[in-house]
Amino acid sequence: MNFENIPEYVNWEDEIPVIQYKALTDTGCVEHGFSTRLGGVSQGIYKSMNLSYTRGDEKGAVDENFRRFCDRLHMDWQKIVSTDQTHTANVRIVTKADEGHGISRPKSFFDIDGQVTDVPGLPLITYHADCVPLFFVDPVKKAIGLTHSGWRGTAARIGRNTVETMQKAYGSRPEDIIAVIGPSVCQNCYEVSEDVARAFMEGFRISDRLVYAKGGGKYQLNLWEANRQIMVDAGIKAEHITVTAWCTACHPDLLWSHRKSGSDRGSLAAFLMLK
């Protein structure tokens, strides 16, 4: 299939579906993708493409899932640098010394929800099952960032922190950065309490598009719009931002969702690597 004019698409090559983005492919300097729940070897509640070692799945199955998915993306799965996600706004500068962190060797850093690097051939990943993956590519300075942004990370503006870390570490200019807000829970599926909604009523441009009051102290929160605002405020051009159309909770046949399945599920992952 020709994806030349499609901003976001599911590439079904080799029966391992990958969600990809024209804007990132067009930079010519990265490999990237977002996994689905299909194309792996895990069984039971993890069937079939589970990419988490922490959910109770067999390690050998998760290893094979990583190998299969990374082969599709022309990445070495044993070099992956994994986050240690605790819903922070912390961003780490990743170097070659971090190769294999959390995948082929034990974790050595913790409480990290975002990563940046300028090292070619070093795959970054973040884990997801409703929270927002944020991709950042600077094709000028040849630097990348990948971030996990749940409501806490979004309220703390981890997307801005990622851009600022790329500026300081690599001299990136925000106006050069190409960004993607990836598959995650949509506003219609994301009901939150008033205390969570309140965190977004201060400091964001408020509209029904961001926080919609449905009554009874419940609100519908749009993390896609919140992160888009954060990116624009950080200096990324609006035309350089692609926003997903894939809601994890709306598509339980294709994507893992904590809102839909609770803890009885696998995990998705976002992948980004400089060529």
Residue ranges and their predicted role:
Residues 1-275:
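Active-site microenvironment for binding and transforming phosphate-containing groups
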